[in-house]
Amino acid sequence: MKLLRSLALLAVATAGLSIHALQAEPLKIGYSDWPGYTILEVAKQKGWFKDAGLDVELVWFDYLPSLDAFSAGKIDAVCVVGTDALVNGANGAKSKIIALLDYSDGSDMIVGMPGINSIKDLKGKKVGIELTLVEHLLLLKALEANGMKQADVELVNTPTNETPQTLASGKVAAIGAWYPNSGQALKNVPGSKPLFTSADAKGLIFDVLAVNPTSYAQHKEEWTKIVGIYYKAVDYLYDPKTHDDAVKIMAAKVGADPADYAKNVPGTHFLTLKEAKAAFTKGDDLMSVYGSMTIGNQFNLDNSVYKESQKPASYLTPAIVNSL
C-alpha cells in the first residue's frame, strides 16, 4: 500500500510539473522589420502582454527566416503577407489567419535609378526584386497598369534586404523593396525615385497574423488577448498624444532615425479593429482580404510557387476579431 501511495503521489507530482511546464512555455510570435509587424514592439515595451497575464515571446527575424521558423514549428505564429501564408500552407504549414494587421499604402515601392522616370522606361532593362515575393506581385501590377508584361523587363533575383546596395551598384535600373529597405534605397542613390508604389494598388498587399492551428485551438483565450493588444498598439500609434513615443520605439527596433521613420509611417495603413472587421468581410475587391488573397493565390500559381490552388477562406479566421 505504501508503494502504491508513493507511486500515486509521484504521478500527481509529475502531472503537476507537466501542466506547469506547459503553462510556462511562452507563445512565440515571429516578427520582422515591416512597420505593421514592428509595432508589436510597442506592446512589448509597454508591458501590455504581462499586464494581461500572457507569456509571449516576440522573436525577431529577417522576413524569410521567420516563414521558415513557422514552417519548422519553432514559433507559434508569424507576422506575414497573406499571400505568403498561402505559400507556407501549400508546403505543409497550414495556418489560421486570426488578425489583419495592415495593408501597404506606399511603403512597398518600385524605385528607379536617376534617369528612369516611369515604369515604361524600364522596358528592356534589369529590375532587382526577390522573386515570388510581394514586390514581384507589385511589379506585375505596375507593368499591367502601364500596358506592359513581365517579359518586357529582365528580373534579377535580389534579397530584399540587399536591394539598396544593388540599386547603388548601378547593376539594375530599378529595384522593388518594402520599407525600411525602400527608404534606404532612395537615400543611397540621390536622384532615384519611386516609379510605382503600393499606394497605387491599395489592398494588394495585406499583412496578417498567421497562427499554427493547434496553438490556436489550445490557446484561443490567449490569442484573443494578443489580438486585442495588437489593436491597442495601433490605437497608441494613432493617438496624437502617444504617436511620437510609438514611432520612437519602432524606429529604435529597426535602427532607423525616428524623424525619418515618422515620415514613412503613412506608407503602412495600420488597421484599426473596426477596419479589420470591415476587411474581413467577404468580397471580390482588393479592400476585402478574401479578394486580395484570391489574387495572391493566382499569382503564386502563375509563377509556379505551388501547383495546387489554395483556398483563402480556409485560412481566414475572423472569429476573434469579430468577437472584440
List the model feature ranges, each with a label:
Residues G296-Q298, D302-L324:
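Hinge/cleft segment of the Venus flytrap/periplasmic-binding protein
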Residues L17-A24:
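Sec/Tat signal peptide C-region and signal peptidase I cleavage site
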Residues A217-V305:
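Secondary-structure end/capping motifs
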Residues E25-T166, A173-Y179, L195, G203:
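Short, glycine-/small- and polar/acidic-enriched structural segments
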